[in-house]
Each structure stands twice: as C-alpha cells, then as structure tokens.
C-alpha cells in the first residue's frame, strides 16, 4: 500500500506532502564531502539521513536517481596537500575511498552517480560565463564574483535578509569585491596549484 511522504519545506518551514515532478523518475541531489581530511561524524549525518530518504523513495517509486557530488578541489584540499606532503590527487583519492568505506560500514547505499568537481570544470566555466552575461556576476583581477544584490531572493531559504549578513564572519573580505557579501565563483591559482584555462585566466572554481 502506497504511503504519503511528508518533508519539511525550508521555504515555508512547514511539513508538506512530497509530490514529485515526475513520478516515473524521482531525482535527488545531495551535497557530498570536501575530501581534504578523514571523514568525521558531521560527514556521516547527511549520508545516513539521505540514505533513509533514498530507500523510502525507492519503496514508493519505480525509478529514483540519487546524485551526490565529491568536492575534490578546494582551498582546504590544497592546504592539506601541502601540509601532508602528498599530491592533491593522492590525497583526494585516499579520503574519497575512506569516505566510501565508512558509507559501507554505515550500511548506506551508493548513489547512482557520484561526480567529482574536477570532472565538470568546463560546465562550471560555462555557467559562470552565463551569469556574467546576464549581469549576475562580474570579473575583477582574474577573480569572478556573484553579485548578491542582483538576486532579490538571496537568503530566502535561510530566512535571512541581506543586511543581516556580516562581512568577515563566514564572508571573505576582499578589496576585489563590489560588495562585502559577494562570493567568489572563480579564483586565480598560484603557479604551484591546480588550474584550468578560463576566459579569466588560469584558475579554479570557488565554493559558497
């Protein structure tokens, strides 16, 4: 017998009945780990929570596609690589393997797809270019920033207003920004750091 599924909608802060856009192919995307250090209990929580949801959905719908990304390029990864005298590739492969082993130990199923960030740099560059074209982002000194004020619904999911954001807390302060709350989409890389060619010079994606 089919059962109704209720999930908390962050936008309304209410429990609402789950109605998929396509009952023949339910899709879920989950933000995965940044693989710079050994997995900890904070990494395990979303794995378990969304594994439960995945299994419930599979019980109710014929096809469920579960995607969970791996962030394998990041400032923390570069820092850890240098501190431990290990290549970024060896470090990220080691931590990814450790993470997947922990998932097995927790009896969590593998997602259908587990894309690595570095496998999709070209798509990120295309998306950033489109944001610049539409006026939502800007380039300055080989950095590209998202201009938060241009997006009127920014903070809607977290119920925070733009003027409540404090520069210098979780927001990186930089003279390259138009506004303190703007966040980086593309960073220039130092000569000893991984980099990809882009319209703004060699660099790597930024995370928010």
Predicted regions and their residues:
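NTP-dependent nucleotidyl-transfer catalytic core
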Residues: 1-207
């Amino acid at each position: 017998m089919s059962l109704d599924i209720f999930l908390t909608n962050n936008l309304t802060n209410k429990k609402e009945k789950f109605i998929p856009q396509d009952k023949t192919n339910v899709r879920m995307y989950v933000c995965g780990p940044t693989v710079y250090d050994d997995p900890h209990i904070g990494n395990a929580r979303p794995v378990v929570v969304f594994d439960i949801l995945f299994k419930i959905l599979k019980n109710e719908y014929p096809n469920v596609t579960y995607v969970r990304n791996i962030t394998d390029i990041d400032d923390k990864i570069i820092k850890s690589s240098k501190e431990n005298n290990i290549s970024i590739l060896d470090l990220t492969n080691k931590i990814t393997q450790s993470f997947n082993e922990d998932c097995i130990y927790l009896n969590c199923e593998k997602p259908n797809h587990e894309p690595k960030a570095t496998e999709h740099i070209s798509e990120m560059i295309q998306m950033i270019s489109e944001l610049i074209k539409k006026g939502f982002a800007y380039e300055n000194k080989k950095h590209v920033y998202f201009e938060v004020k241009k997006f009127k619904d920014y903070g809607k999911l977290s119920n925070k207003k733009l003027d409540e954001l404090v520069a210098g807390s979780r927001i990186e302060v930089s003279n390259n920004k138009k506004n303190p709350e703007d966040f980086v989409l593309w960073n220039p890389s130092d000569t000893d750091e991984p980099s990809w060619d882009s319209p703004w010079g060699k660099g790597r994606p930024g995370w928010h």
